[in-house]
Amino acid sequence: MELLEQRILRDGRLLPGGILKVDSFLNHQMDPQLLQAMAREIKRLFADVRVDRVLTIEASGIAIAILAGLEFGCPVVFAKKSKTKNLADTLYTAEVPSFTHGNTNTVVVSKEYLHTGENVLLVDDFLATGAALVGLRALVEQAGGTVVGAGIAVEKVFQGGGDKLRAEGLRIESLARIASMDEKGIRFC
């Protein structure tokens, strides 16, 4: 998606350790018009499948997931990174290592919000190693649902997660695919 790529080149910043900082428009301060355009593109890319529910992970994927849910006309659920007191004891759980934060989270979704037979679209802001998508897919599988694909804002292709998951049969549509990034700049696929 050229609009997103241009915004990354203009406002994104590279940090040590392979981190792309896009918090001025995507995952801290957000540009609603850009997010809406991204959600519309995800809808276009997945127009051939029925989507009953959108699932993302707390917190940075929530904004784009909500807008995607509006486009598909379906509910949006986000996996929480910790169990809170107001969650029931009937939970689906999965372990998800975080590349950005360098830790592992046990993500949870109440069994009230994922159901057998549902077609679920995974949505997230970044795809690097693929750990978040693996965890989200596990939650859907525990519920007896079907993952129809994953809509991703930014894929770091050089980290291999997308290729691995595609080889396992997961349909992934990424709006911006980064082939490499270093002190010389960001190069898209």
What residue ranges belong to the model's regions?
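PRPP-associated nucleotide enzymes
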Residues: 1-123, 127-189
